[in-house]
A protein has these predicted regions:
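Auxiliary Fe-S-binding modules of radical SAM enzymes
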Residues: 1-28, 221-335
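Conserved, mostly hydrophobic/aromatic
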Residues: 85, 176, 281
Length: 335
């Protein structure tokens, strides 16, 4: 347990300013996520260093396709979430409140493990990492000192204050999950404002953080042409045509029983992304598909071929297409 970094005292109550819910907690009360509590007028986090999952993952699994491809990130997750999505693929930890006594991992021990496992960076993921803000900040500072990169895989519903803390501490890349348009997000994810997610992505990008966007394409939720066009056009218009968009396949999980995303729907999402002017659109959870690869937007040359989460061909020289010399946006090279 640690005192939270972003809080506002309110005559015995306390407001949490980590995520955009900005919960106001009465004495003894918990926030929506159940990971923060008002104890004696002070906001405390109940999951500092409480690790539910730990794995050395290919960076492609996040997914990041334009950020140190072929490297590995030691990935840690904790408990709970600030969204209520009924299809959550990691529901076993995101829908669980923090245990009274969990496995504690200090930031320094985590960084020691990064080196021991041969990873080149860190990733806070699996559940919503914003809930682990205090731990993330310490991890990022130590990682930066040791020459490791730092990444977040997030639903993006973080406050500008939280974003700034993370960036100032060493956050280098963020994959933001855009779940749909405003009506679908409010209906399925428990009254959240999707514009705040876009704002977080724009803020991070303006501060030099590498951004990639992921959309889990779910039948009858966000798979209409209207919704997909809206997402693709906002990426192009608000973040930039060069920002990668991953349209990934959904599989039934937790309380959602809709059938898996048809390949035809995913390929339509790819086409919609290209029609919106996006230079890099990828299909996820479909290993071996040609749209899982990176192509030069100028000459069409295959630049990076992937099989699952493995890079099997790499044809970039100093971040440029070997065929035509076109500079490919991203963070390249080996760590």
């Amino acid at each position: 347990m640690r005192e939270a970094l972003l809080q506002e005292a309110m005559d015995g109550r306390v407001r949490c300013n980590a995520c955009e819910r900005r919960c106001t907690l009465i004495p003894g009360g918990f926030g929506w996520c159940r990971t923060r509590q008002n104890r004696g007028g002070k906001l405390v986090t109940l999951i500092y260093g409480s690790v539910s999952s730990l794995a050395a993952n290919p960076i492609e699994k996040k997914p990041f396709y334009h950020f140190y491809p072929g490297t590995k990130a030691l990935t840690a997750g904790s408990w709970s979430c600030n969204f209520g999505c009924p299809w959550c693929q990691n529901w076993d930890i995101s829908k669980s409140p923090p245990p009274a006594k969990g496995d504690y991992l200090s930031p320094q021990r985590f960084i020691d493990s990064v080196e021991r496992t041969g990873c080149q960076g860190t990733s806070i993921s699996f559940n919503e990492p914003t809930l682990s803000l205090e731990w993330s900040v310490e991890v990022f500072r130590l990682a930066k000192q040791s020459g490791f990169y730092n990444t977040y895989v997030t639903n993006g519903y973080m406050t500008p204050e939280a974003s700034s803390l993370l960036i100032n501490s060493g956050l280098e890349a963020m994959n933001v999950d855009i779940k749909g348009d405003a009506p679908s997000v409010k209906k399925f994810c428990k009254m959240v404002d999707v514009d705040r997610v876009w704002a977080a992505a724009k803020l991070a990008r303006s501060r030099g953080v590498h951004i990639e966007i992921t959309t889990l394409v779910i039948p009858a939720v966000n798979d209409s042409d209207l919704v997909l066009h809206g997402i693709a056009e906002r990426i192009a218009g608000e973040l930039g045509r060069e920002v990668p968009w991953h349209a990934t396949s959904y599989f039934p999980a937790y309380h959602f029983t809709a059938p898996p995303t048809p390949m035809q729907t995913l390929e339509r999402a790819w086409q919609i992304g290209k029609e919106a002017g996006l230079e890099f659109v990828y299909l996820g959870n479909v290993a071996g598909h040609r749209y899982d690869n990176t192509y030069c937007p100028a000459c069409g040359t295959l630049l990076i071929r992937r099989l699952g989460f493995e890079v099997v061909e790499y044809r970039l020289d100093a971040g440029k297409c070997r065929q035509c010399g076109r500079s490919i946006p991203g963070v390249w090279g080996n760590r």
